[in-house]
Each structure stands twice: as structure tokens, then as C-alpha cells.
Curated annotation (Swiss-Prot):
Pathway: Alkene biosynthesis; ethylene biosynthesis via S-adenosyl-L-methionine; ethylene from S-adenosyl-L-methionine: step 2/2. This is 1-aminocyclopropane-1-carboxylate oxidase. GO terms for biological process: ethylene biosynthetic process; fruit ripening. Keywords: Ethylene biosynthesis, Fruit ripening, Iron, Metal-binding, Oxidoreductase, Stress response, Vitamin C. GO terms for molecular function: 1-aminocyclopropane-1-carboxylate oxidase activity; L-ascorbic acid binding; metal ion binding. Residues 153-253 form the Fe2OG dioxygenase domain. It catalyses: 1-aminocyclopropane-1-carboxylate + L-ascorbate + O2 = ethene + L-dehydroascorbate + hydrogen cyanide + CO2 + 2 H2O. Belongs to the iron/ascorbate-dependent oxidoreductase family. It comes from Diospyros kaki. Induction: By water stress. Pfam families: 2OG-FeII_Oxy (PF03171), DIOX_N (PF14226). Its cofactor is Fe cation.
Length: 318
């Protein structure tokens, strides 16, 4: 079996750059996922993020999860639970406006550390988007502009903990789905596994690695690349031992960004048969909210129905 793609970003600055770009392109085309090492975010900062996140969960969320979810979700069940997830989560918004100061129960160290971490992830996301542009033959900055809208991109972090589950065979930590947005940067637990992606009809583990950042592509990049890159189904399998930490940061288009295949990636002779629609990102998100755990193709088809109403202005400039 092929091994999960791991990209050493230190090699981007030397004679192995072309080969490394090839690995990134192959991962985007054939996996929809890859894992970055030596990505430039200090290991000491990542250790601090992990420490304060796990401390916050134990102090503020663990008991709440036991009372509100764990005590009720598995009571008397015999068949698989398909309408909920075994996870404890909250969301931090960074762009266009941060909400970190408003989220209750966060101490000042946590707010400061997560703000620093988010700023570094934002830069890494934009750097990766430019690498994707290079591999796709698009002008530098194209994807960032495509995401921009009038107020810039949406960027936020879902902080999740997946506690041990006594009936891990009957409930998922997180049910299978593709991500709606752009590019996702995940800092995951390096000891407790659980994340899996679907490749060639088989569920494959995303290996936990210390200080790595896992990258996956969302539905919007599939549309903009006209299907050259694909978003991929993934899930979190509940574990009987250990609490898994997951800090997933989503660099997404702005709400009013108009998303459509890059003209340079649409073959002229098949323009009439475009697979992917043009739509406003916020409209897609409203649809996705109801259909997250279903196939993405009907979502794309549904957006074609409203395509006639989309006012396609020029691509935004930063």
C-alpha cells in the first residue's frame, strides 16, 4: 500500500524543491491530504498550544461532555448512532474579525497563544495556496484573490477533543464528510489516533506525528481547480482509550466571494459541459450546513440551480 504523503518543507529552499513540489502536486491530485514537517512553526509554540488546549478541556469541558453527551448518547443503544458525533468542540474566529476575546472560559495565556498560532497558520495557508498556484500553472496569488471577496477570507479554528468512548464501535468521533471550505491546517494529537481518509474505497489512517501539520483540501479548491484537485471524505474513529486533541484551522473564502473554476483550467472544447457551478460561498455554506454528512456531488448540482442568479463580477484584487 502507498504510504501517506509527508512533505519536508525544509527541502523547498534547495535543489530538491522541484521534487518536493511534485510530491505536493501528487498528494493534491491523488490524496487530498498531506502532512507537513519542518513547516516553520516553532515546536515550542506547538507544545504550548497543546498544553493549554488540553488543560482547558480538563478544566472547562470534560465534565460538561460527560453530563450532556456521554451520559445520554449511548444509553441503551444496540445499533450504530448516525445522527451525532462523539466530540467536544468550540470555534475560534480569526478573520475577518477575531472573537477570541469573547469566547468564555479562556484564560489570558490561552487567548495570547492561540492568536500567535493562528497568525502563523494564516501565513502558512497563504504560502501553500501560492505553491498550489505554481503547480496548477496559475499566476501567483490567484487562489488568495479568488477567496478574497470584499472583506478578505474567513479564517477560524475548530478546537475538538475526542474523549474515550466505551462503545467506540457504535458511534463515530466525527462522521464521514468532505470539508466545505478552502484549505485546512490540522494540528492533531501525536499519541491518540483516529483520523482516517477514504482512498480507493479503503479507510486509511492519517498517521499521528509530533509537531506536524496535516493539510487537506476543501470543496472550494475542487471547484476552483475544476476537479484537478479533489476534496476527500474523512472521519474520526472513536477510541476506547485516551482523549484525542484536534485543532483544525480553516482558511476559507470570504462570505461574498464568487467561486468558479479558474478559466485557465477549463478546457475550451468542454466549456459547455462544465461539471462545477459558479456560486457565492455563503450560499454554499448554507446548503452545506444541512447536507454536511452527505455526498458533495448533489451539493454542486444544487448550486447549479441558483447559478443564474449569481452576479459574476471581476475576481477580487487584494
Amino acid at each position: 500500500m502507498e504510504s501517506f504523503p509527508v512533505i519536508n518543507m525544509e527541502k523547498m529552499n534547495g535543489e530538491e524543491r522541484a521534487a518536493t513540489m511534485g510530491l505536493i502536486n501528487d498528494a493534491c491530485e491523488n490524496w487530498g491530504f498531506f502532512e507537513l514537517v519542518n513547516h516553520g512553526i516553532p515546536p515550542e509554540l506547538m507544545d504550548t498550544v497543546e498544553r493549554v488546549t488540553k488543560a482547558h478541556y480538563k478544566k472547562c469541558m470534560e465534565q460538561r461532555f460527560k453530563e450532556l453527551v456521554a451520559s445520554k448518547a449511548l444509553e441503551g443503544i444496540q445499533a450504530e448512532v448516525t445522527d451525532m458525533d462523539w466530540e467536544s468542540t468550540y470555534f475560534l474566529r480569526h478573520l475577518p474579525q477575531s472573537n477570541i476575546s469573547e469566547v468564555p472560559d479562556l484564560d489570558e495565556e490561552y487567548r495570547r497563544v492561540m492568536k500567535d498560532f493562528a497568525e502563523r497558520l494564516e501565513k502558512l495557508a497563504e504560502y501553500l495556496l501560492d505553491l498550489l498556484c505554481e503547480n496548477l500553472g496559475l499566476e501567483k496569488g490567484y487562489l488568495k484573490k479568488a477567496f478574497y471577496g470584499t472583506k478578505g477570507p474567513n479564517f477560524g479554528t475548530k478546537v475538538a477533543n475526542y474523549p474515550p468512548c466505551p462503545k467506540a464501535d457504535l458511534i463515530k468521533g466525527l462522521r464521514a464528510h468532505t470539508d466545505a471550505g478552502g484549505i485546512i491546517l490540522l494540528f492533531q494529537d501525536d499519541k491518540v489516533s483516529g483520523l482516517q481518509l477514504l482512498k480507493d474505497d479503503q479507510w486509511i489512517d492519517v498517521p499521528p506525528m509530533k509537531h506536524s501539520i496535516v493539510i487537506n483540501l476543501g470543496d472550494q479548491l475542487e471547484v476552483i481547480t475544476n476537479g484537478k484537485y479533489k476534496s476527500v471524505l474523512h472521519r474520526v474513529v472513536a477510541q476506547t482509550d485516551g482523549t484525542r486533541m484536534s485543532i483544525a484551522s480553516f482558511y476559507n473564502p470570504g462570505n461574498d466571494a464568487v467561486i468558479y473554476p479558474a478559466p485557465a483550467l477549463v478546457e475550451k472544447e468542454v466549456e459547455e459541459k462544465e461539471v462545477y457551478p459558479k456560486f457565492v460561498f455563503d450560499d454554499y455554506m448554507k446548503l452545506y450546513a444541512a447536507l454536511k454528512f452527505q455526498a458533495k456531488e448533489p451539493r454542486f448540482e444544487a448550486m447549479k440551480a441558483v447559478e443564474a442568479n449569481v452576479n459574476l463580477g471581476p475576481i477580487a484584487t487584494v
